[in-house]
Each structure stands twice: as C-alpha cells, then as structure tokens.
C-alpha cells in the first residue's frame, strides 16, 4: 500500500493533467506527517498542480467568445467558473494542514479577484471600442458582475449542483 506522500503526489499529478481526476479519498496529512524534505517535495507537487490548472484556466481567457451572442458567452462563463471551482477544491481540501490550506486559499482569493477584475476590464474596453452591440455588451457585463468568478471562493459553491445531480442519479 502506498504511503500518504505517494498517494498525494500521484493524485496531484493526475489532477493536474486530467480534468476528470478527483482528490476524493486522499488521506489527511499534518505538518508533522513528513520530514522537512518530503514536506517541501509535497508542496512542490501542490504548486505544480495549481500552476498547471492556472495555465489551463488562463488559456480559456484566450477562448473568450469574441461574439455578440449572449448565450454563447453565458455558457463559456459558467464553464470557466466551474473550472475555477475545481482549483478551489484543492486549495480547500480537508486533508491538508490548516497552514497550507490557509496559504492556498489566500492566494486563490487574490488570483481569482484579479482575474475577475481583468475580465471586467476586457469587457469595458471592448464596449468602448464598439466591438459588441451596446445592449448585448451590457447584458454580458451584468452577467460577469452578477455571477463573479469570486463566487467559487465560497466553500458551499456548487453544493446545490452536486446535490441536484445526486438526486437525479437516484
């Protein structure tokens, strides 16, 4: 049977490259679970996994629909938010020590807030440049403001969706 470090390292590598991989069933770890060298290696695995996830998410920004179609943008926006929710699941994983979780959550709050601001800025610039019809641009901007990326920072984000899915499966 694999030890906790191997289990976490394998799960993080898989999670970083496979959007369907989960972090469920990982053993809890504490700051004392490993010697300092192994602890640093595990932190590197976490950092690498988050970096890959962030890069993949940033690539979605390049796929920002350059269209006046509100519904296409809405679908893209909700998918984008759900991808960030996956990142938050790692940052807030109950198996991580409080110190690590606190640091990851603080970093996530800053990054996601910055991304929200960046997207709002893009939409404001496109409106000024006249790339979107005024009414559609306003609806898209309102959507981004009323359903912000920062919603994923709430630990209960997605709970209702998961419950609904579970009920539909039963």
Question: Where do the language-model regions lie?
Answer:
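Conserved S-adenosyl-L-methionine
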Residues: 161-166
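Class I SAM-dependent methyltransferase "Motif I" SAM/SAH-binding loop
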Residues: 157
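Short intrinsically disordered terminal tails
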Residues: 1-2, 167-170
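Long, low-complexity or tandemly repetitive, helically biased scaffold regions used
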Residues: 9, 16-154
């Amino acid at each position: 049977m694999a030890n906790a470090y191997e289990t976490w390292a394998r799960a993080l590598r898989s999670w970083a490259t496979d959007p369907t991989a989960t972090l469920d069933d990982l053993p809890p770890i504490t700051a004392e679970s490993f010697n300092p060298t192994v602890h640093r290696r595990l932190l590197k695995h976490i950092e690498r996994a988050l970096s890959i996830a962030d890069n993949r998410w940033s690539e979605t920004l390049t796929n920002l629909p350059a269209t006046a179609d509100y519904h296409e943008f809405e679908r893209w926006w909700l998918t984008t938010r759900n991808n960030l929710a996956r990142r938050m699941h790692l940052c807030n994983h109950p198996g991580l020590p409080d110190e690590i979780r606190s640091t990851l959550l603080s970093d996530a709050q800053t990054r996601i807030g910055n991304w929200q601001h960046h997207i709002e800025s893009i939409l404001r610039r496109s409106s000024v440049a006249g790339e979107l019809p005024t009414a559609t641009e306003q609806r898209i901007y309102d959507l981004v403001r009323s359903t912000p990326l920062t919603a994923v920072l709430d630990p209960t984000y997605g709970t209702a969706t998961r419950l609904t899915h579970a009920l539909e499966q039963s």
